[in-house]
Design a protein with these regions (language model features):
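Active-site beta-strand/loop architecture of penicillin-binding DD-peptidases
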Residues: 1-56, 71-171
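A short, flexible N-terminal coil/short beta segment enriched in small residues
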Residues: 68
Length: 175
């Protein structure tokens, strides 16, 4: 089959669980700065309406206990599940979900990879941190990557780690 969801769509599907039921518009940059290091365009969290027919911004109708169960499950993935072998981030707990998706698209067919019982696999990992109060969420997708936790997991972990390392640099420089 074909991958019908983009990484941004996969990320978007989990945001209500990380933001107490609210949809948050994904953002790819923190801020825009000029040559002198001054912030020209700051980052602003933008909420999206789960029910656009009403005048206010609505939450996705998910019970709080469901949000808690999903988040605890994603924490357990990294603590003692498929993501337990990922490197830790010093001083930060993170959570996530790995995914491995068999596929047989036109590229795999041309390479004769679509063998019944041994189809090629895409690697996925969605991670966020800190686990208790998320600031950042990341999706890693590796085409024909194999096992999600082994291939895409380390990619997501490295992005999360880089975020927190850069955050420490900002703090050290008073930003």
């Amino acid at each position: 089959g074909y991958v019908l969801a983009t990484p941004i769509q996969v990320l978007d599907s989990v945001t209500p669980f990380l933001n107490n039921g609210f949809l948050v518009k994904p953002t790819l940059i923190k801020e825009v700065v000029d040559g002198e290091g001054r912030v020209v365009t700051p980052f602003q969290v933008t909420y999206r309406d789960a029910l656009p027919d009403t005048p206010e911004i609505d939450r996705v109708p998910i019970d709080g206990w469901v949000i808690d169960v999903v988040r605890r499950g994603m924490e357990k993935v990294v603590q003692d599940g498929t993501g337990k072998d990922l490197d830790r981030i010093e001083g930060v707990t993170f959570a996530g979900k790995s995914g491995t998706a068999e596929y047989c698209d036109n590229v795999a067919q041309k390479k004769n990879l679509c063998q019944f019982g041994a189809w090629p696999e895409h690697a996925w990992f969605l991670g966020y941190a800190p686990a208790d109060k998320p600031e950042i969420a990341v999706v890693a997708f590796v085409y024909n990557g194999g096992e999600g936790s082994l291939v895409a997991g380390p990619v997501a972990q490295q992005v999360l780690q880089a975020y927190f390392e850069l955050k420490q640099v900002d703090v050290a420089h008073g930003q």
